């Protein structure tokens, strides 16, 4: 007995259900497209007009958008198409767009998505104070913000952020070199009560005055990165030890004025510090120079 012939081309077996015949909002969007990588969805929408409509409906309902999922570089026109209908975003990461992202590209997206809670703009050097103002004013639920390596962030921009973001918990200001102690002091006084994580790394303008004010106003601070803050010294670290009972990690590498005596109290509490105690450093150096590996116990 010969097996039945399978349908070919556009033929369809009687009673068969096509993929696009399944309920879009009840089945395809929540149970299928949500599990497909964004890069694959962009290819899928080229199959037909129906698939394009399905993908656009999915994009309109996105809660999280990370441009890195599209690729290391994403053209301006592609980003505009992807986010054209999105109005419910809660997380937005645009680091791969850093070479060209401007206020004109970003501000309309922020205006359509007031529910944003997490925004990553690291390295986006073409933005300005206008974009940060739109974010602060239009997204009152903002909790996490990365502005790392955004040289345009100055004291006035940070003041606007501190005034309008009551829910702010995590802030990355790495290499925002225009910021000085006065701006950080204002941030601490306005938003310190809720701050849990802060990076001020690679900023030679930040000193003990800023660190001490953070310590006094940020009782919930868990993580503080002061890497390369050359003006920070032992006084600032002692104040952290006194006023920040839940501090879990402290980064002070290349802070040459921070003495071990100020760090020891934090070490005893189990705070993770990226600088080894002097005795440990000496033993490692001895091991490297003299080849005493079998004889030196590095436990201190």
Curated annotation (Swiss-Prot):
Acetylation in keyword set: yes
Pathway(s) this gene product operates in, as recorded in its UniProt entry: Protein modification; protein ubiquitination
Annotated ranges, domain F-box: 19-66
Keywords for the protein's UniProt record, in alphabetical order: Acetylation, Cytoplasm, Leucine-rich repeat, Repeat, Ubl conjugation pathway
Chief place of localization: cytoplasm
One GO biological process term: G2/M transition of mitotic cell cycle
SUPFAM superfamilies per UniProt: F-box domain (SSF81383), RNI-like (SSF52047)
Subcellular location: Cytoplasm
Residues recorded with modification N-acetylmethionine: 1
Pfam short name (any one): LRR_At5g56370
Region (Interaction with SMURF1): 113-269
Origin superkingdom: Eukaryota
LRR repeats: from-to residues: 141-162, 167-188, 194-215, 220-241, 246-267
SMART domains with a match to the protein in the record: LRR_CC (SM00367)
CDD domains, alphabetized: F-box_FBXL15
InterPro entries: F-box-like_dom_sf, F-box_dom, Leu-rich_rpt, Leu-rich_rpt_Cys-con_subtyp, LRR_dom_sf, LRR_FXL15/At3g58940/PEG3-like
Cellular component GO terms, alphabetical: cytoplasm; cytosol; SCF ubiquitin ligase complex
Protein's job: Substrate recognition component of a SCF (SKP1-CUL1-F-box protein) E3 ubiquitin-protein ligase complex which mediates the ubiquitination and subsequent proteasomal degradation of SMURF1, thereby acting as a positive regulator of the BMP signaling pathway. Required for dorsal/ventral pattern formation and bone mass maintenance. Also mediates ubiquitination of SMURF2 and WWP2.
Family: Belongs to the FBXL15 family.
Subunit and interaction comment: Part of the SCF (SKP1-CUL1-F-box) E3 ubiquitin-protein ligase complex SCF(FBXL15) composed of CUL1, SKP1, RBX1 and FBXL15.
Protein name: F-box/LRR-repeat protein 15
Lineage: Eukaryota, Metazoa, Chordata, Craniata, Vertebrata
């Amino acid at each position: 007995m010969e097996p039945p012939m399978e349908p070919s081309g556009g033929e369809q077996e009687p009673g068969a259900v096509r993929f696009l015949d399944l309920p879009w909002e009840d089945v395809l969007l929540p149970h299928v497209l949500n599990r497909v990588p964004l890069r694959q969805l962009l290819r899928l929408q080229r199959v037909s007009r129906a698939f394009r409509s399905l993908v656009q409906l999915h994009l309109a309902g996105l809660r999280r958008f990370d441009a890195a999922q599209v690729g290391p570089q994403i053209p301006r026109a592609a980003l505009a198409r992807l986010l054209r209908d999105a109005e419910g975003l809660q997380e937005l990461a645009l680091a791969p767009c850093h070479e060209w992202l401007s206020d004109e590209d970003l501000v309309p997206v922020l205006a359509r998505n007031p529910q944003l809670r997490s925004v990553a703009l690291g390295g986006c050097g073409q933005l300005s104070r206008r974009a940060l103002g739109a974010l602060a004013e239009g997204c009152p639920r903002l909790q996490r913000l990365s502005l790392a390596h955004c040289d345009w962030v100055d004291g006035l921009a940070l003041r606007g952020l501190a005034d309008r973001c009551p829910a702010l918990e995590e802030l990355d200001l790495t290499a925002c070199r225009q910021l000085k102690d006065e701006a950080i002091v204002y941030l601490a006084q306005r938003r310190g009560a809720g701050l849990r994580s802060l990076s001020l790394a690679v900023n030679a303008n930040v000193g003990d005055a800023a660190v001490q004010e953070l310590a006094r106003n940020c009782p919930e601070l868990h993580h503080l990165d002061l890497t390369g803050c050359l003006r920070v010294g032992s006084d600032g670290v002692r104040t952290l030890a006194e006023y920040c009972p839940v501090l879990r990690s402290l980064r002070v590498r290349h802070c040459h004025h921070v003495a071990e005596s100020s760090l020891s109290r934090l070490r005893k509490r189990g705070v993770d510090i990226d600088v080894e105690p002097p005795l440990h450093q000496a033993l490692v150096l001895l091991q490297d120079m003299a080849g005493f590996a079998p004889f030196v116990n590095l436990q201190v």
